[in-house]
Amino acid sequence: MARVKRAVNAQKKRRTILKASKGYRGQRSRLYRKAKEQQLHSLTYAYRDRRARKGEFRKLWIARINAAARANDITYNRFIQGLKIAGVEVDRKNLAELAVSDAAAFTALVEVAKAALPEDVNAPAGEAA
């Protein structure tokens, strides 16, 4: 049987890892073993944070909607409740965009939400006074 030499494969593997770890500080960009370990961590963080990013954006949208809603004398909670009762199906991303870029349209939505809300704050959502 012929002898299998793996020098080329090993060099390619190391080169790939070191290329991917460019930009890391210190030994993590120069030494293969350190670079490999850092690369594993980096990929783990990237995977985790791609999922966390979705929650972060939702928090940002809610903060923007709340600020704009309070400027129109209604809380975020009551605003969303009013929109649901009125049957307005606009997601938080678009509501936040309206709040930032088109104040008049957002104010119109606030008026729709206020009109749909029951007069009595403690009344159930389905029963308008």
Swiss-Prot record:
Example of a GO biological process term: translation
* One function term, GO molecular function aspect: structural constituent of ribosome
Could you tell me which CDD domains the record lists for this protein?
Ribosomal_L20
Q: Which SUPFAM superfamilies match?
A: Ribosomal protein L20
Q: Which InterPro entries does the entry mention?
A: Ribosomal_bL20 (IPR005813), RIBOSOMAL_L20_CS (IPR049946), Ribosomal_protein_bL20_C (IPR035566)
Write down the Pfam families for this protein, in alphabetical order.
Answer: Ribosomal_L20
A GO CC annotation recorded here is: ribonucleoprotein complex
Alphabetically ordered keywords of this record? Ribonucleoprotein, Ribosomal protein, RNA-binding, rRNA-binding
The similarity comment for this entry is: Belongs to the bacterial ribosomal protein bL20 family.
The record's function comment reads: Binds directly to 23S ribosomal RNA and is necessary for the in vitro assembly process of the 50S ribosomal subunit. It is not involved in the protein synthesizing functions of that subunit.
| Protein name per the record | Large ribosomal subunit protein bL20
Natural source organism: Mycobacteroides abscessus (strain ATCC 19977 / DSM 44196 / CCUG 20993 / CIP 104536 / JCM 13569 / NCTC 13031 / TMC 1543 / L948)
Q: Gene symbol? A: rplT
